[in-house]
Each structure stands twice: as structure tokens, then as C-alpha cells.
């Protein structure tokens, strides 16, 4: 079968042929319809330090997908051939304390599809049936293909009560922009998002952000005055991993504010702990999606009118994958879909 794989320890992704995967007793085989390119895939493509220390070579990559089940293992129940599914890309052990307590997103032994094991950029993918998630008929393949990053946005945005709150989002990449849409959908008052990329700020505006701020030209505190904010933001969603963005967020939070962090700052990031301690801030780290509460929330929001369709800006046939990666790397895109049909 055809796959997109990391074949060499250097920049790039290559199309290759590999044997059709076998179906285990508790697995499902999924014929892939569409995939999306993730920021993680771009790290693997660029072959940066993280990728060099993490990714085995050769390996099929990719973890954002939708497809149709073509085979089910003999021990599988609840799924059948023909079911349209996406899937949770974090494979957990099922035996540790967190897994047994229903906190599978905190499993210490998590393996990532397309990171630590064979990925979804392929004609067929095998995953444990417990990681598959059925897609309702009124949700499109394009939407289902981005459930992984949509889930990151959902998990982050819904970590704290947003009703009537003023929300600051740092980082207007696809996940940040989707978080803006979610925050408005669930009842936030002001949703302000910061970045230095005008294309992505414009996209965040289309997604529902109250105010976008290019911090290379505007002061966030001036914008707070403009929109009649006097006490600071109630909730912060840190999506950028940028040290300066995080420090700015801390300065602009209200006393008693809450921050959910999905972005990964540098290991040596310096912050003013006075901002955290004397403001009584709560900071929560976010990894992946809650299994599977986040997935049900995503479906419920889409079915109740949440529109995140503007986040998909480009679509390519899988044979045009190089254009897809070039587009994603340009900074002038939202989500990029690869069609495997």
C-alpha cells in the first residue's frame, strides 16, 4: 500500500510502498479517506532536534485522519465493517493508575500514532478498536479529519468555565483559532487573540475572535483599554509556546485568573513568579484530548452550530503532498487536507 514516510534522517517526507497491515485481535483496519497535516508533522518534515531525538527511521507518519473500517479483530465489539471513524492518536497502556482511573490522557506510557508507531499517512491504518471514534452522518470527512487538533483546542478551551468571561489566547495557529471559535460558542464575552502573523490573525477573526492583536504593532494593554477592560483577563489559553507571549499573558491576567497551557515554552523560559503567586493564578498543563469526553464535546458543539470550517484553507490530492507540506510551512494557511480517495 501507499504511504508517506520518513525514510531518511534528513529534511523531507517520501511516498513509498509498504505491506498491508495485519489486524490484531482487538484492532480495526481503517481505509483512510482524508488526512490533515499537523504541526508535529512539520517538525518531522523539517527534521528538527525534537524529531531527531524522537522519530524512528524509517516510519510512516501522520495522525490526523478519517476513514472507513474494512476489517475488525475477532475480539472487537461495538464496531463493524463500513463504520466511518476517526481515532485517538494516543495509544495508552490501560494498566497504569491514570488509565485505570479513567484519566487515559495522562498515561505515562502513551505511544503516539505517527510518532512512536506507524502513522495514518497511508492507504490503511491499524489501531486498537478502543481508539476508534464513530463519526455521525452530519459531520463531514473534512471536519472529522481534523478532530485531533480540534480536540486539542476543545480540551484547552473547556478546561475552565468561559461563560461571561474575558479570554486571552496567545498564538493564532489553527488550534488557537479553533479555540477562539469554541470560546465564543460557549459564551465568552471578549475573546482576544495575539500573534505576529497577519494571515493567521485574519483567520482567527473569521473564526469568531472579538479582537485580534498583532503584538509587533500593537500593545495588548492598549487593546484592553480600547475594549473597556479594567481588571485583566479571566482565562488565558496559551497556544504559542512563545516565551514573550506567555510573559505578556501573565502580566495581563486578572487576579484569580486561570491559564490552560497547550503551547510548550522553552526549557529555560524565565517568568516573573510574582505574577503567578500574588495574583493567585491557576496554571493547568494540557496534553492531547480527554478520552473520550473531549470527543463527545466536539461532536456536540458541531451539531449545535459551531462552525470551524474556515480553518481548512487548502486541499490537495495525496500525490500532491509536497505542495501540502510547502503550504503548511509557509505560514499562510490554516489546516491542510490530503485526499486519499
UniProtKB/Swiss-Prot annotation:
InterPro entries: ADH-like_C, ADH-like_N, ADH_Zn_CS, GroES-like_sf, L-Threonine_3-DHase, NAD(P)-bd_dom_sf, PKS_ER, Zn_alcohol_dh
Enzyme class (EC, first level): oxidoreductase
Annotated positions binding Zn(2+) 2: 93, 96, 99, 107
Matches recorded under PROSITE patterns: ADH_ZINC
EC numbers: 1.1.1.103
Swiss-Prot/TrEMBL catalytic activity: L-threonine + NAD(+) = (2S)-2-amino-3-oxobutanoate + NADH + H(+)
Residues reported to bind Zn(2+) 1: 38, 63-64
GO molecular function, one term: L-threonine 3-dehydrogenase activity
Cofactor(s) the protein needs: Zn(2+)
Source organism, top-level taxon: Bacteria
Binding site for NAD(+): 175, 195, 200, 262-264, 286-287
Cofactor note: Binds 2 Zn(2+) ions per subunit.
Pathway terms, separated by semicolons: Amino-acid degradation; L-threonine degradation via oxydo-reductase pathway; glycine from L-threonine: step 1/2
Keyword Metal-binding belongs to the record: yes
One GO BP annotation of this record: L-threonine catabolic process to glycine
SUPFAM superfamilies: GroES-like, NAD(P)-binding Rossmann-fold domains
Keywords (A to Z) from UniProt: Cytoplasm, Metal-binding, NAD, Oxidoreductase, Zinc
A cellular-component GO term for this protein: cytoplasm
Catalytic residues of the enzyme: 40, 43
Record-annotated site: Important for catalytic activity for the proton relay mechanism but does not participate directly in the coordination of zinc atom: 148
Pfam families named among the record's database cross-references: ADH_N, ADH_zinc_N
General function of this protein: Catalyzes the NAD(+)-dependent oxidation of L-threonine to 2-amino-3-ketobutyrate.
NCBIfam families for this protein: PRK05396.1 (NF003808), tdh (TIGR00692)
Quaternary structure annotation from Swiss-Prot or TrEMBL: Homotetramer.
Annotated family: Belongs to the zinc-containing alcohol dehydrogenase family.
Protein's recorded name: L-threonine 3-dehydrogenase
Organism whose genome encodes this protein: Marinomonas sp. (strain MWYL1)
Lineage of producing organism: Bacteria, Pseudomonadati, Pseudomonadota, Gammaproteobacteria, Oceanospirillales
